[in-house]
Amino acid sequence: MPPVTGDWLYKYRMLTEKVKNLNIDEKKFEQLFTPEVHSVADVLRKYGFDARVVGGAVRDFIRGQDPRDIDFATDADPSELIYMFNMEDIPHDDKGIGHGTVKAVFGGGKVDVTSIAYKLELKDGKIRAVTGQDWEQDAQDRDLTINSMSIDKDGVLYDYTGGLDDLRNQRVVMLPHTHDKITEDPHLIMRWFKALGYFDNPRWPKQDFEIIKRHMPLLAKIKGLEKTDRELSSIMRGKNGQKIIRMMCSAGADKYL
């Protein structure tokens, strides 16, 4: 599994990859945009807001896999979500509003809608609210380029970081802020190794792996043996699972897990 050398790739892709139209597999697309999600998206658009599926579900959809956890997001803030749902007589649950999430309740199910304009962030050991982000800022704030894409109900893929190109070329590339966030969230180390298992022949920037190795001692701070076991099991279930586990150990993970 050879690394990609240099950081020029990220800088170049930032300038070239913006908005793309996909040839949509209708059945797969219906798994992303269920009738309930369509209904919520229609309401948000009626009031001038955007609505997209974001993150890992988009990655899996492009890879032709069934998306598991579907994250549905909007640029409306939580108070605007509640206002719109009230105006349209949509039952909702606002217990998650502290995290920017409002749940729309339908007869056939529920849709969690999370605002990209409001989020909680851990910085220097303290939790603070971040407001006013747009779609591109939200994409830049994710961990990997392949997890930063979003897609709307019309099948338009929004790619601000070159994630589609990386996905097609089996590259696992950290977004710049992830280098700093690892100190606050060591789980990002496990997620990086897990992402290698999405591909038959993954590649990565050399500098990313150097950062991963340098932060290996932080794995000792991860609380909960059950969660660690879940992450390791997930890595083993991926492609080249044993090889990736050996790679983790050679980088020093076995000393801290």
What are these regions (language model features)?
Residues 2-5:
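Extreme N-terminal basic, low-complexity initiation segments
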Residues 7-257:
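Catalytic cores of the polymerase beta-like nucleotidyltransferase superfamily
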